[in-house]
Amino acid sequence: MDTVVPDLMKVPQETSFDDVGRLLRARDLAPLPRDAARPVLGNALVSLHGAAHRQRRISENKLFSPDALRRYEEDILEPSVREAFAALSALPEDPERAAVNLPAFVTELILNISIALIGIDRRGEADRKRIYEFIDPLIAAHEIEWSTEDSTAAIARAADAQSRFWTEFLEPAYRRRQAAHREGGWTEPADLLSVLASPDSGIDDDTAAQECALYLIASVFTTTSTITNTVELVSGWCEEHPADRDLVLDSSSDFLSRCVEEALRVRPPIKPLLLRQATADASVGGCPVSAGATVGANVAAAHADPAVYPDRPEKFDPTRAPAVQVRRTHYSFGDGPHLCIGRPLVVGDPRAETEGDAAHIVRAFFAADVRTDPSRPRRFASTARKRYIDYPVTVRIAR
């Protein structure tokens, strides 16, 4: 196995597509304990492994059933997109086009689904704005290994945000669901808080707060990054292949879904290196790994493996296909027992006949003739990897 390039992660790593997949699927490799982020995510799903992980995941799978996915898309996402784009007509700027910060606009859209998924009862505009304030500090904790900020200060801000999120929004909704369970059961659509509030869950308040914080940042962060990257990459592709713009707008075509998957391969919205710790003596890629040792799955390298993507793998090309048969075309949602539970929200689910948040929102931007705004600068997050926090665009206003 090779050695990791970033100094902060000098651990053995796998880099080939096949070996990364095997590492992620290995049952004896658990997510590396993240001591720095423990106050914020220590007992959340992403930190669990083995029986505890399986039990938590089984209980939360109902949140991503076909019926639930259809409800999120039809009852929440679609009207939210219509209302958000219609509201742009009220902006006192160019009468034909509106200036939009793409990541912020998308985050506000996705936040509507996140609130329903978690089960937050207060959903007014002022409430959403307040919840929005918690997102960046919590994301910083989730990315703490790659942050260029002071980690102690970042974790302190995240812990404060999580505490306020719990006190102001989560705890009242959680107590209401606990009371409902005591009085005969929760009869409204399942949400995360109703699952955690079940007497059978064994969840304490701290764990409930951490799980809700995870769901907030995971649902918002992954989707926002994916959509921003897809809009940028598809815009460049359509400049070179103008006929494909019609395919982007065609909801009966799978072209846009392939664009989303290719964007996920070219620009993974996750950490470029997924760290695992051996829970027992194991073998990865034919190399022995001692219990307690740390190994890494280099997702970025795997996505550029010439054995799978021989033709300019760094280039965005939604028409490409892997050169060999593979289980999945990228590892941006992981693989194996820790495959992202919320993946169907982002890329859709054939069982539910949903196309996913990413394709739906990207199509809405192209239907509004999205264009990069060169008059305003782009800005990146304070991390060692590229993530937009400002990506200015303009869109046509529907009158």
Briefly describe each language-model feature range.
Residues 28, 298-325, 333:
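Conserved cytochrome P450 K-helix/beta-meander segment immediately N-terminal to the heme-binding cysteine loop
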Residues 71-225:
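Cytochrome P450 heme-thiolate monooxygenase catalytic core
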Residues 130-147, 250-259, 321-324, 380-389:
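Short, mixed-charge aromatic SLiMs
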Residues 314, 320-391:
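Cytochrome P450 heme-thiolate "Cys pocket" and heme-binding signature region
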